[in-house]
């Protein structure tokens, strides 16, 4: 067959299979569509907090904020929403990813991003609002535009600070803010960043600058350990806890609703058991829920299915490695992992002696590892007569013993 024709037929067959699943498209895109808030995964209460912070800052009461939550909870998506919400209002907005840099390198990145994201167009011309300052702006831009990963030697920190101050106080409209969005801010919680955090003590008090940092639940504690005064500079904490079960169901429902063909039922093509499995296993983490649903749909398309049941969801979780069992395996040391895998090969339970013989290791070594795994709650102990049997938890049984069954589809 002609390769072009083959590709065209494959593409049209996917559209047909998608239709059988009662979907117009796969609504579980993990990457947020920039500027599209239809697939928002957070809560209205979090948006309200951000709105209040922005409103207060516009009236002179600037309070920098940390957006904290576990991996995959939607912190980057929240920064994305702040970016577009504030950009539409005409504020200057700068997106940065935290890294271990000196204050001077941070200032250079900030200055460059302010210029390229707010003042200079993609074609390299200055926006009409700022033409009266064109000479000085172009001078800054020329110094920074070609530096790449190198720090321009001819641009001392004092001059950078003066140029930044000039942009904020003279070029930016006085009724607008300069909003700095910093993702993965845990990178700053290192001793090598002490000088940068000390610089933040004064910088985060600058008038007209509002900063949002996103990081793990322990972000503020970790930053404060390195530099105690930083706590006062970031007084607001927006906590993003995992979704409740109801919120998890709602997230899936909202996404499906948008993609359904006419006549589809609430959670189609997922069965009730499949949805329940996703909600139970994904711990309220939006990224896990979205990835599992997306992978399940991909498997269903590949196999020409019309329904997605619990078996398909298990296969999706297996291929993604995001079930609770997989998380436990990732947490174990190689020696501990070897022992639980051996237990699975022995049917899910074994004595110290059986494992020692099977793995050809001393009973004392096996016993030490088993005690550690037992203390973590990943295996259980049961006495049968004179013997003590160690048994895999349900989560480990599902992933280690259920693997073969799951893949025979």
UniProtKB/Swiss-Prot annotation:
A single MF term (Gene Ontology): DNA binding
Domain of life, source organism: Archaea
One Pfam family it belongs to: HTH_5
Taxonomic lineage from the root: Archaea, Methanobacteriati, Methanobacteriota, Methanomada group, Methanococci
UniProt keyword annotations, A-Z: DNA-binding, Transcription, Transcription regulation
Identification of the protein by name: Uncharacterized HTH-type transcriptional regulator MJ0774
Domain HTH arsR-type: 305-409
Origin species: Methanocaldococcus jannaschii (strain ATCC 43067 / DSM 2661 / JAL-1 / JCM 10045 / NBRC 100440)
